[in-house]
A protein has these predicted regions:
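Residues located in well-ordered beta-strands
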Residues: 45, 75, 110-112, 234, ...
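C-terminal capping/lid region of NAD(P)-dependent oxidoreductase domains
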Residues: 2-3, 7, 18, 22-44, ...
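C-terminal substrate-binding/catalytic core of Rossmann-like NAD(P)-dependent dehydrogenases/reductases
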Residues: 311-360, 368-369
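Mid-domain Rossmann-like dinucleotide-binding core that forms the NAD(H)/NADP(H) cofactor-binding site
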Residues: 181-262, 266
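Glycine-rich beta-strand-centered segment in the early N-terminal region that forms part
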Residues: 64-79, 93-141, 180-182
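Glycine-rich cofactor phosphate-binding loops and adjacent beta1-alpha1 units
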Residues: 204-207, 250-327, 368
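NAD(P)H dinucleotide-binding glycine-rich loop of Rossmann-like/cofactor-binding domains
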Residues: 98, 135-214
Length: 387
């Protein structure tokens, strides 16, 4: 992995008023889930953003978080490494301006409920669960009108508060998602990015329509199999990496294109009555890919944008949106909790193919190798075995 020049940390940003942060003081050992499990230690292993620069550190004596009355303490089994974690690892401009030094990172996981607060009623110790990583107090306008995924007071697990790259994590009861026994652990550990793909595909209404996916990273690849399962008439995809293009074909894409090559937009039009794709799912955040994707979108088409550019971009609004009459959707996170029900239904239907995407499992002690696999492109989705 090539060295990365650290970006100076920005001034501390204000923390939005929202859900209370769990305490992390040492606690007396308590009994784990029923069944004779051993008592829990007062400390745990956790991956911490230990300084304002590249990398993470394994802290072997982090205090176990203490659940509040409406919180759930979860023992983490597997945790997924995602693009946000890579930003934090590399300490790019976004991470330096957003991530508090000392935080436990990570937000994708599967685990078992260890302990619940006194006011928790919906989950019990011993349940296998995942969780929605966007946490809100459910008080603002968006939360109260069905759009909690874009609430003003949202705090993100592993970004604004301690996350799941640890033996234990605390989340509010409302965010806990009990898992169907038909969903295996390695899939349950990556429901967060799968939810991004499902939200994007479902928002765009792909059934019986031609779909172009620009960028087949982890979520773009998931979008290929989700779009196919959701009834897309044709799925086309682009990526610079030939390995990812090949995997997109394996997951159900009808054709893939190298966006650096000539003539591929004309090929998309040739496959779509000469008009262009009905739907664009932009997953890359690349300025060039965004421009090309809108060029390949038909007049009156729908574009759903999930990819996040690393900096502001120049965009031909006149020709790509106004004169084209395009519908443009900004996609953020997962709809809480409509997307989770859709994910569960799709997974249990057997129509999603995710096993080829989850390529590596590493021990948490070998976390540096996990990040290297992801950054090099050798790994697609890497999950860590935490406990």
């Amino acid at each position: 992995m090539s060295p990365i020049t650290p970006v100076p940390a920005a001034a501390a940003r204000p923390v939005p008023a929202g859900p209370a942060m769990p305490e992390t003081r040492p606690v007396e050992s308590v009994q784990s889930a029923p069944g004779g499990a051993p008592s829990r230690s007062r400390t745990m292993r956790a991956l911490v953003k230990h300084h304002a620069g590249p990398g993470l550190r394994l802290d072997a004596a982090r205090p176990v978080p203490v659940p509040g009355p409406r919180d759930v303490l979860i023992r983490v089994r597997l945790a997924g490494i995602c693009g946000t974690d890579r930003h934090i690892w590399e300490w790019d401009q976004w991470a330096a301006s957003r991530i508090p030094v000392g935080i436990v990172t990570g937000h994708e996981f599967v685990g078992v409920v260890e302990e619940v607060g006194s006011a928790v009623r919906r989950v019990t110790p011993g349940q296998r669960v995942s969780a929605e990583g966007h946490i809100t107090a459910w008080n603002d306008y968006n939360s109260r009108t069905g759009n909690a995924h874009i609430a003003r007071d949202t705090m993100i697990l592993g970004v604004d508060r301690d996350g799941c790259f640890a033996e234990y994590v605390v989340v509010p009861e409302e965010n806990v998602w009990p898992l169907h026994p038909g969903i295996p652990d390695h899939v349950a550990a990556v429901l967060d990015p799968l939810g991004n793909a499902v939200h994007t595909v479902m928002a765009a209404g792909v059934s019986a329509r031609s779909v172009l996916i620009t960028g087949t990273g982890i979520i773009g690849l998931m979008a290929v199999t989700v779009a196919r399962a959701a009834g897309a008439a044709q799925v086309l995809a682009t990526d610079l990496d030939p390995r990812r293009r090949a995997l997109a074909l394996e997951l159900g894409a009808d054709e893939v294109f190298d966006p650096a090559g000539p003539g591929w937009i004309e090929q998309v039009r040739a496959r779509t009555r000469g008009d262009g794709a009905d739907v664009l799912l932009e997953m890359s955040g690349s300025s060039a890919a965004i421009d090309q994707g809108f060029s390949a979108l038909r007049m009156g088409g729908t574009a759903a944008l999930l990819g996040i550019p690393s900096r502001p971009i120049t965009f031909d609004l006149n020709n790509h949106v106004i004169f084209k009459g395009a519908t443009v959707l900004g996609i953020n996170g997962r709809r809480m909790f409509e997307t989770w029900y859709q994910m569960e239904s799709l997974l249990l239907s057997g129509r999603l193919r995710l096993d080829p995407i989850v390529t590596h499992r590493v021990a948490m002690s070998d976390f540096a190798r996990g990040f290297e696999l992801m950054i090099s492109g050798e790994g697609i989705k890497v999950v860590m075995e935490v406990s």
